[in-house]
């Protein structure tokens, strides 16, 4: 199965989210109980993949700001005191899609949208707060670097853009 079989679009108010199950209850509950509210108050923008009208994957993006002193010196060097970023607040695939290599495609979809947004509104980093070691390993595989002492990983938007230009 390829990501070409899915429609990637913004979350619609009428989307039925009740059958989404990623095997991560906190991600499933947030989608069902909070995604529409986050949209309405503009605290997060959720994009979904649909297949035959059903939501089978999603990610949520939000604005974020780092304090330079919260970053390792090698990452924050040359930055202002407050550094604009994009937070990948949520990213999940329905459990029936696990193990098919689609997590990377979903992250690439989110990354493309971040690159476009960063052309309009400045963002130096992409940040993700991981739930566990498996998620940390996933993001590390795609070039994200951990911030010591946290469950947070970061990647420069310029590095993302470079990777997509190289493809």
Protein language model regions, located:
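Conserved acyl-donor/pantetheine-binding loop and adjacent beta-alpha core of acyl/acetyltransferases
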Residues: 58-90
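Conserved beta-hairpin
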Residues: 42-63, 70
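Conserved acetyl-CoA-binding loop-helix of GNAT-fold acetyltransferases
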Residues: 99-113
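Conserved N-terminal entry element of GNAT/NAT acetyltransferase domains
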Residues: 1-23
